[in-house]
Design a protein with these regions (language model features):
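Short, basic (Lys/Arg/His-rich) helix/loop patches that form interaction surfaces
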Residues: 101-106, 203-233
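Basic, Lys/Arg- and aromatic-enriched nucleic-acid-binding interface segment
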Residues: 45, 66-126, 130
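Short, contiguous acidic/charged loop-to-helix segments that flank catalytic cores in large enzymes
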Residues: 101-105, 143-156, 189-198, 216-223
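Conserved tyrosine-mediated DNA breakage-rejoining catalytic core shared by Y-recombinases
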Residues: 72-73, 131-170
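Active-site/catalytic core of tyrosine-dependent DNA strand-transfer enzymes
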Residues: 91-92, 158-216
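N-terminal core-binding DNA-recognition domain of tyrosine recombinases/integrases
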Residues: 5-82, 97-101
């Protein structure tokens, strides 16, 4: 489809892609870039299954060499949306201060408070949080574009949101980013790797927080947005 082609060409950075360039490593990086852009697993699967169909057709026409299990390492199935919203009881637990104990680390506390900030910013996705720029903040208003859709959004910060933002904002004067999540130039492979590592660590810390709080559902970076959408409407 046209959307699949556009996604591939955007990732490739050119208007050409040869079949011999499609390797398990290339596919894994393509899958990762789609997730970094905010695509759901089902969207990722749609793109990869479309590409696989084109590849298989090319093999049949002897336009491409057959590579066994080429798509084995990437996701080509379908899954139900598991981004469950927290109920009010669990959200109260998340907003409550974690009691001091040996089980709580600074990383867990930071993840909990960033999660609260994302919720207060109308369910801001982690990918948008990571790529926010200092220039996006003017006074108590953040204006930015969703990386997934390109849609422009503005959010007015509450007192609590401003407190958390000022607590965790980037102190490095030379950095254009509002938060110290990324350090490399936007769009570079290194920035993508930094984002992936930060997201993985954020979700790991949130999972620990969720277990410590005894939440009924798994706490993850998606939960803030899904919960905000549920409570807002």
């Amino acid at each position: 489809t046209g959307s699949t082609l556009n996604a591939i060409l955007t990732f490739q950075g050119s208007d050409r892609l040869s079949f011999w360039e499609i390797t398990p490593e290339w596919l894994k990086h393509f899958e990762g870039s789609l997730r970094a852009r905010g695509c759901s697993w089902n969207t990722v699967s749609t793109y990869l299954r479309t590409l696989r169909a084109v590849y298989n057709r090319a093999v049949d026409l002897r336009k491409a060499s057959y590579v066994p299990h080429l798509f084995r390492s990437v996701y080509t199935g379908t899954r139900a949306d598991r981004r469950r919203a927290l109920d009010m009881e669990d959200m109260k637990k998340v907003f409550a201060r974690l009691l001091q104990s040996d089980a709580i680390t600074p990383a867990m506390k930071g993840a909990q408070e960033l999660f609260i900030l994302m919720f207060l910013l109308r369910g801001l996705p982690f990918v948008d949080l990571a790529y926010l720029r200092k220039s996006d903040l003017r006074g108590n208003v953040i204006s930015y574009r969703r990386r997934k859709t390109g849609r422009p959004l503005s959010v007015t910060l509450t007192t609590e949101a401003m407190f958390l933002l000022q607590k965790y904002m980037n102190r490095e004067e030379q950095s254009p980013y509002l938060f110290p999540i990324l350090h490399s130039d936007e769009g570079s492979p290194m920035a993508y790797r930094e984002y992936q590592l930060a997201l993985r660590n954020f979700n790991y810390q949130l999972e620990l927080v969720g277990k410590l709080l005894g939440l009924k559902d798994r706490l993850s970076s998606y939960t803030a947005r899904h919960t905000w959408a549920t409570t807002a409407y």
